[in-house]
Structure formats: structure tokens, C-alpha cells
A protein has these predicted regions:
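Gly/Pro-rich turn-and-neighbor structural signature
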Residues: 3-90, 200-256
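A generic structural motif
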Residues: 7, 110-112, 126-128, 138-144, ...
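Long, charged, mostly alpha-helical binding arms that flank functional sites
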Residues: 158-211, 225-228
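Internal mixed beta-strand/loop scaffold within catalytic domains of large alpha/beta enzymes
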Residues: 56-134
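Glycine-rich, often proline-containing surface loops adjacent to acidic residues and nearby aromatics
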Residues: 69, 100-102, 131-139, 185-206, ...
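Compact, glycine/acidic-enriched structural inserts
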Residues: 128-172
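Short helix/loop capping segments that flank catalytic or ligand/cofactor-binding pockets
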Residues: 83-85, 115-117, 144-147, 263-265
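Long, contiguous binding/interaction regions
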Residues: 261-285
């Protein structure tokens, strides 16, 4: 019989390990720029009436000279969906409202407009089903074709190792998902997005867990390279203004359309951790 409790524990351990490695690398980048910035970690605990073990997480935030604001949240929560929300969740519903979710979510907003902002998250959920989801997308205020191509190539390599059609499917899903309908524009230059990689049996779990780990490794490999390439580029006041207006679009997407934001708010998550994706400053013209 499949042991979802043990599998959740393994996924959680991986997400925490990935968090530690990413945060260490971001602190290294700050040190290279002459900054002493470090992550500040805050633990939080979820509350749910009648639930003795609702779970919680740890939110890490750093405000540096290169990474103006970066937030990394790792959480593991257990509970029961409200009936109307349960109906929207894979494998849930009125007869199966219980869930467990563990995952890592990261958003980095950069001080230099030439350095792309970025989002990455991966997660493992169980309802009456168990599945992995996640992805990452690059969000440059000033796009560079080289950066875009290398970011996509890193995720394509991760996808190709696990499924011949994965990259095309998950890139198209990202293009559809990271779109701002009321603006008629994409949030950034894309990446990959996947969900509902069902783990019906131990073999499927191991395969999808391996893919999810490779997505995390791809991010950890490529994004610091892009930051180091652009962080010393001189920028103008016009460049900064372009960045701040673009950040407004990013905030609109996350507050109106983002699934993770909705899931966190609907399941009693930590509000500060949920909204850590918002930029430190933005403008609207």
C-alpha cells in the first residue's frame, strides 16, 4: 500500500534542502557585491478549528543590494477544504475534503532592472489522489534573448530527461498560465508550469519526484548565472521606471490570478508568506 505520509516527509525534506542551497547561493551573490545581507527566517503555524496538527512553515526573506527582495517559503500543511473550494481541487470534493500539501515557493525581485526577476515553486499534494506540481518563469523588465534562451534550455534539459513531450506541454502551459488577461500581455518570457502529475503507485511517485527534483536543480543552476551576468550592468532612470511599471503588472497577476495565492488564502496560510511574492516597490501610470 502506498505510504503518502512517508512520501510527504521525503518531499518536505527535499524542499527544505533545496531552500537551504538556494538561500546560501543568493547570500554568496550578495557577498560578491560587497553586501552583508542575509536571510531572515520566521516560522509560522497554521490554525484550523478542531485540527490538532494543521502544520505550518518557514518564511525566509532577504533584502540586499543585488536581490532587492527575495522570499523563499517552505511549508507543510494539513487540513480540510471548505466545500466550495474543495470542488475546485484535484481529487477533493464534498466526500473527500481533507488535504496535505508540502512545497517550496520562491520569488526574487532584483535591484538592477537588467537582472530578471524570477519565480519558482514545486509542491506535493494529497487529497484522494497524490500529485506533484510546480514550475518556474523568468520575468525581466528589460529582456535579453540570451538570458531567455538559456533559462528555457535549462528547464528543457530537465524535462527531456523525463518525458519527450514534457517541455512542449509544460512550456505551453506556462504561456497560458502566466498571462494577464485584463492587460493582454504575458507576465514575463515564460518557463514551464505543470500540475496534477499523479502518483498512483510508488513507481509513479518516484518518477514524478525525480522530475520535480530536477526542476529545482535546473533553477539553482541557471538563475544565479543570469544574475551574475547582469548585476553589474549600468542602468538609467528610464530603465528603473520601466522596471517599476513592470512590477505593477507582476503584482496584478499575483493578486488576481495566481493559484498559489488563492490556495494559501483559502487554506488559512500565513498571509505574509503568501504575499511575499509582491515587489518591494511598484508604480502604475
Amino acid at each position: 500500500m502506498q505510504d503518502w505520509i512517508a512520501q510527504t516527509a521525503r518531499a518536505r525534506a527535499w524542499f527544505e534542502s533545496l531552500r537551504d542551497r538556494i538561500c546560501a547561493e543568493f547570500e554568496n551573490i550578495e557577498a560578491e557585491a560587497g553586501s552583508a545581507a542575509k536571510f531572515d527566517y520566521t516560522s509560522w503555524h497554521r490554525e484550523e478549528a478542531g485540527n490538532p496538527n494543521p502544520g505550518g512553515g518557514t518564511r525566509g526573506v532577504m533584502k540586499g543590494q543585488v536581490l532587492e527582495k527575495v522570499g523563499v517559503n517552505v511549508s507543510t500543511v494539513h487540513g480540510t477544504f471548505a466545500p466550495e473550494f474543495a470542488a475546485t481541487i484535484h481529487g477533493a470534493g464534498a466526500e473527500n475534503p481533507g488535504f496535505t500539501a508540502t512545497g517550496i515557493s520562491l520569488v526574487a525581485h532584483m535591484a538592477n532592472p537588467h537582472v530578471p526577476a524570477v519565480h519558482m515553486n514545486t509542491r506535493f499534494l494529497t487529497t484522494s489522489k497524490a500529485w506533484f506540481g510546480g514550475g518556474g518563469d523568468l520575468n525581466p523588465p528589460i529582456p535579453y534573448p540570451q538570458d531567455t534562451a538559456e533559462f528555457h534550455a535549462a528547464f528543457q534539459a530537465a524535462c527531456d530527461a523525463h518525458g519527450a513531450d514534457y517541455y512542449d506541454r509544460f512550456k505551453a502551459w506556462a504561456d497560458d498560465y502566466f498571462f494577464i488577461p485584463h492587460r493582454g500581455v504575458h507576465r514575463g518570457v515564460g518557463g514551464i508550469f505543470y500540475d496534477h502529475l499523479d502518483c498512483d503507485g510508488d513507481t509513479a511517485f518516484e518518477a514524478n519526484f525525480a522530475f520535480t527534483r530536477d526542476v529545482g536543480e535546473a533553477f539553482l543552476d541557471i538563475f544565479p548565472k543570469l544574475v551574475r551576468r547582469r548585476m553589474g550592468t549600468a542602468f538609467t532612470a528610464a530603465d528603473k521606471a520601466q522596471q517599476l511599471e513592470w512590477r505593477g503588472r507582476y503584482a496584478e497577476f499575483n493578486l488576481v490570478y495566481d493559484r498559489g495565492t488563492l490556495f494559501g488564502l483559502k487554506t488559512g496560510g500565513n498571509v505574509d508568506a503568501i504575499l511575499m511574492s509582491l515587489p518591494p516597490e511598484a508604480t502604475w501610470s
